[in-house]
UniProtKB/Swiss-Prot annotation:
Reactions that this protein is recorded to catalyse: 3-phosphoshikimate + phosphoenolpyruvate = 5-O-(1-carboxyvinyl)-3-phosphoshikimate + phosphate
Protein name: 3-phosphoshikimate 1-carboxyvinyltransferase
Pathway(s): Metabolic intermediate biosynthesis; chorismate biosynthesis; chorismate from D-erythrose 4-phosphate and phosphoenolpyruvate: step 6/7
EC top class, as a word: transferase
Species this chain originates from: Blochmanniella pennsylvanica (strain BPEN)
Lineage: Bacteria, Pseudomonadati, Pseudomonadota, Gammaproteobacteria, Enterobacterales
GO BP field: amino acid biosynthetic process; aromatic amino acid family biosynthetic process; chorismate biosynthetic process
Length: 432
């Protein structure tokens, strides 16, 4: 198999995309269902590397489930409480580069007494977890760094009981989400106080919404203080439909705004809890035409696209798609602000995007927490490194909407969240 894909110039985009399930929702729902009382059937589950990591980890921890042949429906038999390893000896779980598995499991496995090592891909060992570990230790958790302080791999001994804890919100919302999902299963109540700015707040809304579906309602004071009752139990909702991935929708909506035609993405709509649906509003402000339904978003190319200057902290994944969309704007630089957390994702996305955008001719200013993109007079064909990062691969595929081809290395990295991305893109593309 080739370790690259060459995308020919695309003349027009037109069609309908059925979105894969949301990665963030899939892995949260799996973890909550595993700890709930009763059996839960999840449908439209994402079939991807990250979700397989969560499923493998849960099986190794003694959770039983039945997965359909297409891996999109999963029936989970909840254990009715916090997860505890059935292995009396040390258990080692390797979690790839899946932050939506590593961070929540650190918290979930900090309640019961056990001896579990969590490790993963080399890049995972560069992704910080100190803010999460510090918060859990305040509540009694015994956690040991095995190599570098502040980073995986780690050893978990359990011991979290509750109390008042402080957690920093400036690096990743996954830290707060992970603690929130664990606290109902602790022995005592937990009062969580957020220290500093809270990034990617819509992901907290996803977490709180899912917890409510599983029977736990968390009160908070403007996202600064969270009041979490302990000694509670999650209750299975029975059936739960995982909505489509709004981050994945961004590529197809942007493609339509650039080279439409009309594209309809099915699986998310006006009532979605995912912050990345706001990307459609940004496209509209840039000149695209947007229509909303309960279960779809539709984009039609309108006027030439305008540049934007935005704080995109609440949509960190879809904001990457904006960086590529900016190449096709007509009136000056686009500036994406408050994106430091790009640096601690699957790659240092800020540095990676700057490097690869320069290859195709864009004038780039890379700041500590911002990116300024001035479109080139003519986009140049290039060989794009993806840094084993699915979102970089999918973003740069949109360069083919110009009049040049683009070569994407390691296209299989999209297996992390969207295994058939290139097939789906091809299905709505008319080549030049």
């Amino acid at each position: 198999m080739n370790d690259f894909i060459k995308l020919a110039p695309i003349k027009k985009i037109q069609g309908t995309i059925h979105l894969p399930g949301s990665k963030s929702i899939s892995n949260r729902a799996l973890l909550l269902a595993a700890q709930a009382t009763g059996t839960t059937q999840l449908t439209n589950l994402l079939d991807s590397d990250d979700v397989r990591c969560m499923l493998d980890a849960l099986r190794n921890l003694g959770v039983s489930y039945c997965l359909s042949n297409n891996r999109k429906t999963c029936e989970i038999n909840g254990i009715g409480g916090p997860i505890q390893s059935k292995n009396n000896n040390q258990l080692i779980l390797s979690l790839g580069n899946a932050g939506t598995v590593m961070r929540p499991l650190i918290a979930a496995l900090s309640v019961q007494t056990q001896n579990i090592v969590l490790t993963g891909h080399p890049r995972m060992k560069d992704r910080p977890i100190a803010h999460l570990v510090d918060a859990l230790r305040q509540g009694g958790a015994r956690i040991e760094y095995m190599e570098r302080n502040g980073y995986p791999p780690i050893r978990l001994y359990g011991g979290y009981y509750g109390g008042e804890i402080f957690i920093k919100g400036s690096i990743s919302s996954q830290f707060l989400s992970s603690v929130l999902m664990m606290t109902p299963l602790a022995y005592r109540d937990t009062l969580i106080k957020v220290d500093g700015a809270l990034v990617s707040r819509p992901y907290i809304d996803i977490t709180l919404s899912l917890m409510k579906i599983f029977g736990i309602n968390i009160q908070h004071d403007n996202y600064r203080v969270f009041y979490c009752k302990g000694n509670m139990a999650y209750q299975s909702p029975g059936d739960y439909l995982v909505e489509g991935d709004a981050s994945s929708a961004s590529y197809f909506l942007a493609a339509s705004a650039i080279r439409g035609g009309t594209v309809r993405v099915i699986g998310v709509g006006r009532n979605s809890k995912q912050g990345d649906i706001y990307f459609a509003n940004i496209l509209e402000s840039m000149g695209a035409k947007i229509a909303w339904g309960d279960n779809y978003i539709e984009c039609t190319r309108g006027a030439d696209l305008n540049a934007v200057d935005l704080d995109v902290n609440n949509i960190p994944d879809a904001a990457m798609t904006l960086a590529i969309t900016a190449l096709f704007s007509i009136n000056g630089p686009t500036i994406l602000r408050n994106i430091y957390n790009w640096r601690v994702k699957e790659s240092d996305r800020l540095a990676a995007m700057a490097t690869e955008l320069r290859k195709i001719g864009a004038e780039i200013v890379e700041g500590y927490d911002y990116l300024q993109i001035t479109p080139p007079f003519k986009i140049e064909s290039a060989y794009i490194n993806t840094y084993d990062d699915h979102r970089i691969a999918m973003c740069f595929s949109l360069v083919a909407l110009s009049d040049v081809s683009i070569i994407i290395n390691n296209p299989k990295c999209t297996d992390k969240t969207f295994p058939d991305f290139f097939t789906q893109l091809s299905s709505i593309s008319v080549l030049q």
